[in-house]
Amino acid sequence: MKTQRLIRSAVAAGTLALAASPLFAASSPSVGLSVTASVAAKCIVSSTSAVAFGPYDPVTTNSSTGADLDTTGSVGIKCTPGNGVSISLDSGANASGNQRRMQGPAGSSSAFLNYNLYTDSPGGTAWGNGANGASPLAITASSNASERTFTVYGRVPKGQDVNVGSFSDTVQATVNF
């Protein structure tokens, strides 16, 4: 009798186990779940470093028989990967035609100091915005969104007759994509 009870208990437990197994579970056909996102093209000018020429000496060092005054600065950009871009530099706040100029002491006929900006070396390829006689710097697409920094080469031509004082200008950097 104990054996029959044991057998009945085993059969009942086995039946319950089979009924709960996936073989007997109800199911429906599987359906794909669509997951989407879009990544927009985006670029920003993320940093700049001033083009600081330092002292200009029109009497000896930078006179017409002297040397040009050269220096560098930089423009940093961050862009969506795979996005080809260009960086434009406008003519500045004090330009005369296509000539960039730094403003000096007010009220002087010699209140401007001419300068130029370049993409590759002082006196090399002029860096502009396409409207100021020079082209933007075209950049190949990046494989990541890390900041990329580009050197801005600056030159103040020798032989300018300017008054004593501080000279400055502001150039707008724009990333086009």
Where does each model-flagged region fall?
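Surface-exposed, low-hydrophobicity beta-strand/loop segments enriched in small/polar/acidic residues
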Residues: 109-114
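Extracellular beta-sheet repeat scaffolds used for adhesion and glycan interaction
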Residues: 122-146
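Bacterial N-terminal signal peptides that target proteins for export
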Residues: 2-11
